[in-house]
Amino acid sequence: MNPSSSILPIAFLVNKLQQELALCESELWTPHFNTGRYEGNWTSVSLRSQSGLVSDITSFPNIEYINTSLLERCYYFKEIMDWFQCEKEAVRLLRLGPNSEIKEHVDNDTSYEDGFFRIHVPILTNSEVFFYVDKKRVPMKMGECWYANFQLPHSVENKSGEPRIHLTIDCIRNEWSDKLFAQMGFDTSSFSNQKEYSHEVKQLIIEELSRNPSEINAKIIADLQAK
């Protein structure tokens, strides 16, 4: 069985991460749409989204993503993205406010075995942030680069008086990433076939896309409704 989480053999400069975060602080950070999953303050801005809007923080698989205007100002974030030699989907900054909690939940089809991997790069964090995946604490430090299988139960609690902010990059598995993950001790021989969306999942995707009207999102909705 593959690890529930693993640190990647790459680290990034904390001072550069925090400098670029400062460029993003003036943006309107959008509250996470699933209010039942957290208590306190959980917000985000997008560097790459389905509509190209900074405020579009939804993340669904097998949908085209484009860079936002914010990414064009964030050269170091783009350099980090380019390190991953694979297709990227949603790229976001996720902020968990002081004394806030993301309740335990699962995100479907977000394991490496499903052909997907989500990367976390902590920009602001501290010892009072408790990140658990499959009941095991993941000790992420600023500048480190981590993968976790978010199809497993996971939760985060920020018990500090400071925000916790991560850069997250959603990636599509390929030969390059297989070599990387094999070096990290993963069995890369397994690969799940792409799944068809259930009616309920389609409706959820359509609902979230409808919250950010755009020509691109309208096309995605039409394609989903036609299937």
Locations of regions flagged by a protein language model:
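Non-heme Fe(II)/2-oxoglutarate
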Residues: 1-84
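Conserved short histidine dyad/triad with adjacent acidic residue
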Residues: 93-112
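Short, conserved beta-strand element in jelly-roll/cupin
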Residues: 95, 112-128
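A short beta-strand-loop-beta hairpin characteristic of the jelly-roll/cupin
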Residues: 103, 122-142
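Short beta-strand His + acidic residue motifs that chelate non-heme Fe in jelly-roll/DSBH
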Residues: 103-105, 129-131, 148-149, 153-160
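A short hydrophobic beta-strand segment most commonly corresponding to one strand
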Residues: 117-122, 145-147, 161-179
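Double-stranded beta-helix
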Residues: 169-204
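Charged, low-complexity interaction regions
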Residues: 210-219
